[in-house]
A protein has these predicted regions:
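Amphipathic beta-strand/beta-sheet edge segments enriched in Tyr/Trp
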Residues: 70-80
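Short glycine/serine/proline-enriched coil/turn segments at secondary-structure junctions
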Residues: 15, 66-68
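Compositionally biased P/S/T/G-rich terminal and signal peptide-adjacent segments
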Residues: 1-26
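Short, well-ordered alpha-helical segments
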Residues: 20-66
Length: 80
């Protein structure tokens, strides 16, 4: 499956999901609001990493915005 099949969620069911790893991504380019293009780019990077690790679900954590750079840690899972 491609990255369009990866779900961004706020929590997972430990009984239904297997932890596949995590990845930290960052995007340069300041955005005044978290819902801007930079966030979309960041989420796309997380979804791409999930596909590489055979995952289909990601949780975003440790989101930071500093000096025009946004970064986040994505936890990757394969869920049934």
């Amino acid at each position: 499956p491609g990255s369009e099949d990866v779900n961004l969620v706020t929590s997972i069911d430990q009984n239904q999901c297997e932890y596949k790893g995590e990845v930290k991504d960052k995007v340069k380019g300041y955005s005044d609001d978290f819902l801007g293009n930079s966030e979309e780019s960041l989420i796309q990077l997380g979804k791409n990493a999930a596909v590489e690790k055979n995952g289909n679900t990601i949780i975003i954590s440790q989101y930071r915005q500093y000096n025009g750079t946004q970064s986040a840690l994505f936890k990757i899972y394969a869920c049934r």
